[in-house]
């Protein structure tokens, strides 16, 4: 299942991000027709204190040559109103699917979070937007979206689910990984643990 997603992207004329001409803000919606919901991504919500998810979005789904991504939105299907401490990382990648449960897109200390802080997930259904503190320079290829939940507690009385769509049932369709923890936050610089792997992708919106 692929999560529905919205990007907000500042598209730069001629695909040159350092150009000052022909700038245009565009909203990109991915998976708008998805009819599935999941609690496993983008923010894992199956009653664990720590979790990390990573999802691959293809260049043809994003549909722009290059740009600065300034926000991301996910489609809330079950509104829990959970308080979570998260960090979001975006990374340009050639990877188009996961071949195994440890086949992460590797993050390094040079990969700065585009957002880091405390959020409260929606109390109503609908699109939920996270505005980036640092816009991300998207270069036109595939994109890995990693969300590290560092909260350390969970509320068993509340539950979130997010809109998604299926990318198919075969191995080449596996485009989301998730891993959970109980005693400490997931080390995003050392993603060596075996992860859950599945063929759902979140619906989403990017502003560019």
Residue ranges and their predicted role:
Residues 27-29, 53-57, 71-73, 87-89, ...:
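Ordered hydrophobic segments in well-structured contexts
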Residues 31-33, 142-208:
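Proprotein-processing/basic-patch segments
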Residues 34-77:
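A short beta-strand-loop element at or near the start of a globular domain
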Residues 16-18, 34-37, 70, 103, ...:
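Polar low-complexity intrinsically disordered regions enriched in Ser/Thr and small residues
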Residues 2-13:
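Bacterial N-terminal signal peptides
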Residues 9, 20, 38-40, 60, ...:
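Compositionally biased regions
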